[in-house]
Amino acid sequence: MNILIFGPPGSGKSTHSRRIVEEYGLTYISSGDLIRGEIERKSSLGLEMAAYLSRGDLIPDTIVNTLIISRLRRQRENFILDGYPRTPEQVIALENYLYDHGIRLDLALEIFIDEDTSVERISGRRICPNCGAVYHITYNPPKVPGICDVCGTKLIQRTDDREEVVRKRYRIYIKNMEPIIKFYRAKGIYVRVDGDGLIPDVWKRIKPLLDYIHEREKKRKEHE
C-alpha cells in the first residue's frame, strides 16, 4: 500500500502518518524531516533551504525532488509520503519516477483544516532549543510559562511558526494544491478528510478508508 498524505500547516498529517505506519507497517517518508535533517547538519543545501523557510517561501522544486527521489530509491513499496508533492512540477517528477519503476499509488489523502485553525495550531507552538521538547500555549502548555519542563531552558517560537508566516504558507498551499488535487482526483485516488477536532476523532474518519484499501490490496496480491 503506497500513500500520499498532505494538508495545510497544522493539519496533523505528520501525526496521522505515524499512526498509519504503526497500524499498517508502512515506511514513513517525510519531506519535512528530510529538509530539517539537511538544515540541522548546516550543509550548504540546508542553509539555503533555511533561508527560504524563514521567509515562508517554498523551497525550489529541484531541491525537494532530489531529496525525495533519492529516499524513494531505498523504499519502493509500502510507503507513506508526507508533504510531497506540493507543486505541479513535483507531481511530474514523482509520476515519472513511479512510472519508470512500475510503482502504483493507492491513495492521495488530504487532511483539511481552514486558515484560522492552521494559524492557531502552528503559531501557538513553542520549542525548547536545548532538548527539543515541543509545547503549545493552549493545548500543551509548560508548567511555567515560557520555560521548558524538562531542562528549564527558555522556550522559543520558530521563525516559520509566526502568524504572518503561517498565513503565507497556508495560502501558498491552497494555491499550489489546486491543480495537484485535480490531478489525483482525475486518477480516482484522491480523498479529503476533515481535520478539525481532536486527533482520535480525525483518526476515526481516516481508518475505515485505510482498512478498505489495505484489504483490497491484500486480495489483489493474492490473485496475482
Curated annotation (Swiss-Prot):
<feature type="binding site">
    <location>
        <begin position="57"/>
        <end position="59"/>
    </location>
    <ligand>
        <name>AMP</name>
    </ligand>
</feature>
<feature type="binding site">
    <location>
        <position position="128"/>
    </location>
    <ligand>
        <name>Zn(2+)</name>
    </ligand>
</feature>
<dbReference type="InterPro" id="IPR007862">
    <property type="entry name" value="Adenylate_kinase_lid-dom"/>
</dbReference>
<keyword id="KW-0545">Nucleotide biosynthesis</keyword>
<feature type="binding site">
    <location>
        <position position="125"/>
    </location>
    <ligand>
        <name>ATP</name>
    </ligand>
</feature>
<comment type="pathway">
    <text>Purine metabolism; AMP biosynthesis via salvage pathway; AMP from ADP: step 1/1.</text>
</comment>
<feature type="binding site">
    <location>
        <position position="90"/>
    </location>
    <ligand>
        <name>AMP</name>
    </ligand>
</feature>
<dbReference type="GO" id="GO:0004017">
    <property type="term" value="F:adenylate kinase activity"/>
</dbReference>
<keyword id="KW-0963">Cytoplasm</keyword>
<feature type="binding site">
    <location>
        <begin position="134"/>
        <end position="135"/>
    </location>
    <ligand>
        <name>ATP</name>
    </ligand>
</feature>
<feature type="binding site">
    <location>
        <begin position="83"/>
        <end position="86"/>
    </location>
    <ligand>
        <name>AMP</name>
    </ligand>
</feature>
<feature type="binding site">
    <location>
        <position position="31"/>
    </location>
    <ligand>
        <name>AMP</name>
    </ligand>
</feature>
<keyword id="KW-0067">ATP-binding</keyword>
<dbReference type="Pfam" id="PF00406">
    <property type="entry name" value="ADK"/>
</dbReference>
<keyword id="KW-0418">Kinase</keyword>
<keyword id="KW-0808">Transferase</keyword>
<keyword id="KW-0547">Nucleotide-binding</keyword>
<comment type="function">
    <text>Catalyzes the reversible transfer of the terminal phosphate group between ATP and AMP. Plays an important role in cellular energy homeostasis and in adenine nucleotide metabolism.</text>
</comment>
<comment type="subunit">
    <text>Monomer.</text>
</comment>
<comment type="similarity">
    <text>Belongs to the adenylate kinase family.</text>
</comment>
<dbReference type="InterPro" id="IPR027417">
    <property type="entry name" value="P-loop_NTPase"/>
</dbReference>
<dbReference type="Pfam" id="PF05191">
    <property type="entry name" value="ADK_lid"/>
</dbReference>
<feature type="binding site">
    <location>
        <position position="131"/>
    </location>
    <ligand>
        <name>Zn(2+)</name>
    </ligand>
</feature>
<dbReference type="GO" id="GO:0008270">
    <property type="term" value="F:zinc ion binding"/>
</dbReference>
<dbReference type="InterPro" id="IPR006259">
    <property type="entry name" value="Adenyl_kin_sub"/>
</dbReference>
<dbReference type="GO" id="GO:0005737">
    <property type="term" value="C:cytoplasm"/>
</dbReference>
<dbReference type="InterPro" id="IPR000850">
    <property type="entry name" value="Adenylat/UMP-CMP_kin"/>
</dbReference>
<feature type="binding site">
    <location>
        <position position="36"/>
    </location>
    <ligand>
        <name>AMP</name>
    </ligand>
</feature>
<feature type="region of interest" description="LID">
    <location>
        <begin position="124"/>
        <end position="161"/>
    </location>
</feature>
<dbReference type="InterPro" id="IPR033690">
    <property type="entry name" value="Adenylat_kinase_CS"/>
</dbReference>
<feature type="binding site">
    <location>
        <position position="151"/>
    </location>
    <ligand>
        <name>Zn(2+)</name>
    </ligand>
</feature>
<keyword id="KW-0479">Metal-binding</keyword>
<keyword id="KW-0862">Zinc</keyword>
<feature type="binding site">
    <location>
        <position position="197"/>
    </location>
    <ligand>
        <name>ATP</name>
    </ligand>
</feature>
<feature type="binding site">
    <location>
        <position position="169"/>
    </location>
    <ligand>
        <name>AMP</name>
    </ligand>
</feature>
<feature type="binding site">
    <location>
        <begin position="10"/>
        <end position="15"/>
    </location>
    <ligand>
        <name>ATP</name>
    </ligand>
</feature>
<feature type="binding site">
    <location>
        <position position="158"/>
    </location>
    <ligand>
        <name>AMP</name>
    </ligand>
</feature>
<dbReference type="GO" id="GO:0044209">
    <property type="term" value="P:AMP salvage"/>
</dbReference>
<feature type="region of interest" description="NMP">
    <location>
        <begin position="30"/>
        <end position="59"/>
    </location>
</feature>
<dbReference type="GO" id="GO:0005524">
    <property type="term" value="F:ATP binding"/>
</dbReference>
<protein>
    <recommendedName>
        <fullName>Adenylate kinase</fullName>
        <ecNumber>2.7.4.3</ecNumber>
    </recommendedName>
</protein>
<feature type="binding site">
    <location>
        <position position="148"/>
    </location>
    <ligand>
        <name>Zn(2+)</name>
    </ligand>
</feature>
